Amino acid sequence: MKKTKVTLLLDIVTSETFMLMSRDAQAAYLQINARSDSKGRTNRPRAIAKAICADPASVDELLANRFLVVVDEEMGIVEVNKAWEEDYSRTQL
C-alpha cells in the first residue's frame, strides 16, 4: 500500500527521534514543511523559524537529525526529507 503525504508526515512526527527534539525544532519542522514549495524546498528555513519565535538554531537540530537536507549550500536551499525513517536517521549520524 502506497503511503500518502499525510501518512508519511504522521510517521515522522510520531517517531521517537522527532518527539525527543526541542519544541522549537518540532514547530519549525511543521512550519517549514507547510511553507515549502511543491518539492519540499525553501531557502528561508531560519527566517521561518524566527517568524514563529523558534530559536533559529532549531534548523541545525533538524539538519542533524536529517529531517531537513541541504540541497544547495551556496543558495541556502534545504529540502524536507520525505524519505526519512527512524533507522535512517540513526545510521546516517
Annotate the PLM regions.
Residues 1-93:
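Positively charged, structured surface patches that bind polyanionic biopolymers
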